Amino acid sequence: MSKLHVVDHPLIQHKLAFIRDKETGSKTFRELVNEVSMLMAYEVTRELQTEEYEVETPISTAKTRILSGKKLGLVPILRAGLGMVESVRNLIPAARVGHIGVYRDPETLQPVEYYCKLPQDIHERELIVLDPMLATGGSAKASIQFIKDRGGTNIRFMCINAAPEGVEELQKAHPDVDIWTCAVDEKLNEKAYIVPGLGDAGDRLFGTK
């Protein structure tokens, strides 16, 4: 079974309070999602491999450490996942960015892929899938499967807010994919919104309804 990591750093919890607040406008909401994503990225990447590296300082030589493992890839789930990409990529400029979009077929209720553009060397990369919310788990589950179908193997899922139902669904479908979130809330309501949640992240990020 995959691990669930709840990142409860005080700075993250402070910013999450205002992300949840319905009075927070779109501009501030975007900024807060950016900031929280950057803070979360420190934890999500904590176990990246490093190797010893010697540099010349202005005074002498120093033995330091640099990244040495697999290259990284970021895969936001459209559209809300776009709000998390910039800050994470600022920390990891060499990371390649793919995009994946899914929608639910109104008749079959099954996830359908409508867009997918991933790095060609996806099988050589450690991948972080980004989406602010993990509600039912349907989009995350399907997106990760589409990524696996194209050769992705080393995958982590990063969200800001999750419902227990979504966590359970994702863990059941992909027990090899660890989940990072800032909060696991009470439940989903009858409309599949997280309670208390933060509303529709895509609408709040981009000012749409």
From Swiss-Prot:
It comes from the Bacteria. Pfam families: UPRTase. Keywords: Allosteric enzyme, Glycosyltransferase, GTP-binding, Magnesium, Nucleotide-binding, Transferase. Allosterically activated by GTP. This is Uracil phosphoribosyltransferase. GO terms for biological process: UMP salvage; uracil salvage. Its EC number is 2.4.2.9. Uracil binds at I194, G199, D200, A201. Gene3D superfamilies: 3.40.50.2020. Catalyzes the conversion of uracil and 5-phospho-alpha-D-ribose 1-diphosphate (PRPP) to UMP and diphosphate. Its cofactor is Mg(2+). Pathway: Pyrimidine metabolism; UMP biosynthesis via salvage pathway; UMP from uracil: step 1/1. HAMAP family: Upp_B. InterPro entries: PRibTrfase_dom, PRTase-like, Upp_B, UPRTase/APRTase, Ura_phspho_trans. Belongs to the UPRTase family. It comes from Natranaerobius thermophilus (strain ATCC BAA-1301 / DSM 18059 / JW/NM-WN-LF). Binds 1 Mg(2+) ion per subunit. The magnesium is bound as Mg-PRPP. It catalyses: UMP + diphosphate = 5-phospho-alpha-D-ribose 1-diphosphate + uracil. 5-phospho-alpha-D-ribose 1-diphosphate binds at R79, R104, D131, P132, M133, L134, A135, T136, G137, G138, S139, D200. One of its GO terms (molecular function) is magnesium ion binding.
